[in-house]
Design a protein with these regions (language model features):
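Rossmann-fold NAD(P)-binding glycine/threonine-rich loop
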Residues: 33-36, 47-49, 151, 160-203
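Mobile, glycine- and charge-enriched loop segments
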Residues: 52-70, 131-135, 153-162
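Short glycine-rich, flexible loops that bind phosphorylated cofactors or substrates
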Residues: 11-13, 144-146, 170-171
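Phosphate/diphosphate ligand-binding glycine-rich loop within oxidoreductases
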Residues: 1-60
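Short acidic low-complexity segments
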Residues: 114-133
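Glycine-rich adenosine-cofactor-binding loop
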Residues: 45-48, 55, 59, 64-89, ...
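NAD(P)-binding Rossmann-fold cofactor-contacting core
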Residues: 87-113
Length: 203
């Protein structure tokens, strides 16, 4: 075959196996796609591209000039940073329960944004201090088991889209909170899954 898709918990291992890594994989520190080219293994990460494509194409929300807050500072959040910056967001905030983890992510990601000559930098805040945003993205695993952090209502003020990276057969707790707060557009991450697969296939 010409390549392979990789999922949790093997994304970091796939990244370390590769002979070459795309800027997206380097920024994410993980790979979900391996391409085999002339005996070499090339790692890429299409998760963020899948999210951006889902938001802009399927949901019709242009990210250019918008304020985006990402909840969570784990591997899922890390893979979103470079593609969101490349989409032209005006502000990119990472909010985590513990601020030092968000700060560590920002410190890791900012050199990649500089290398791509992107003007935006990652702002790291504690979840309790997260600012309102045009687009709110939940990249935490909370909600996978029907639970989820109770978020301050002010977080949803002026929000155009609340997007949960996980997908389920019913609205996630994050989506339910957003709807209760009056956010008109909410989505789970099924389209992101489809989008990252389409991007992998294109590679």
């Amino acid at each position: 075959g010409r390549g392979a898709n990789v999922t949790l918990p093997f994304k970091e291992a796939a990244f370390s196996l590769a002979d070459e890594r795309s800027p997206r994989a380097e920024a994410a520190g993980a790979a979900n796609t391996l391409c085999f080219v002339e005996g070499r293994i090339i790692a890429d990460n299409t998760d963020g591209a899948g999210l951006v494509d889902d938001i802009q194409q399927r949901l019709g929300v242009s990210l250019q000039g918008l304020r985006v807050t990402v909840l969570g500072a784990g591997g899922a959040a890390r893979g979103l940073m470079l593609p969101l910056a490349q989409a032209g967001v005006a502000r990119l905030v990472v909010a985590n329960r513990t601020q030092p983890r968000a700060q560590a992510l920002a410190a890791d990601i900012d050199p990649h944004l500089e290398a791509q000559e992107l003007p935006v930098r990652v702002e790291a805040v504690a979840l309790a201090d997260a600012p309102a945003a045009d687009v709110l993205i939940n990249a935490t695993s909370a909600g996978l088991h029907g639970d989820g952090p109770t978020l301050p209502a002010r977080l949803f003020e002026g929000c155009q889209l609340a997007y949960d990276c996980i997908y389920a057969d019913r609205p996630t707790p994050f989506m339910q909170q957003a709807m209760a707060a009056g956010v008109s557009r909410v989505s789970d991450g099924l389209g992101m899954l489809v989008g990252q697969a389409a991007e992998s296939f294109r590679l």
